[in-house]
């Protein structure tokens, strides 16, 4: 995505997921260079995904899109392992990826954190985003600002102050507005997938509840009249001074106006979990405990955490898989 973003061309970013997953699978399967090349050819030719997944009212498919790409990437690696070839040159060809999907781009040689050559690109895992809140990433700073302002407003004006707000203004930047603050459906979400990709919903939920969790998107919350009333007061506006700051920062300026004319403002530039404001190891562990223990139990989660912290010493990735298995439960 850093070399050639796909969103503006109408393609979904998971298109790259099939290729990156293929490379991970190729390494795990110990494919030769020739086999890996064919695996990439197969993954790229067959897995171009439409951006419609993330526009307007969103469906359950949003949560499946990348996992589907990863599954197809693994399949491409297995096919290449067994001798199947794919069309080439897949990127520079007459009807290839660059001509029809991404546009031209160049990649630096992959290096790593100890690479001696400064021209080599570091491993991108060091630049990964981790979500602190269960909302679309561009909404992370908005939720953080909303929670801080909620405490400030209630302390100053009383417990019912949030319901007495007259206007909620979310100042943001072009990419964020396009993804989660433009479509009319963002003000009237009827699915979890639309709600967690909605500036109005995420901010309103944070202001009303004082927290944003997975339960913030339960069906009964999507129908909550108080939430819908608060969303009507939300305006999303571009902030010219934010132009060009993403992805180094993801700024949100949240302004609340009360019926008495008092104005409260909070700006958050870099969310917790961003490479510029990383979560601690303890934060990441606690997130896994909170989310996974409901499905696999806390004891299994603790074993998983211990295993992952020593993963580089393991000889076979297959030993990880049983720790990810959800126990069967009788109906």
Describe the role of every protein-language-model region.
Residues 1-75, 82, 87-94:
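Glycine-rich, mobile lid/loop segments that gate access to catalytic sites or pores
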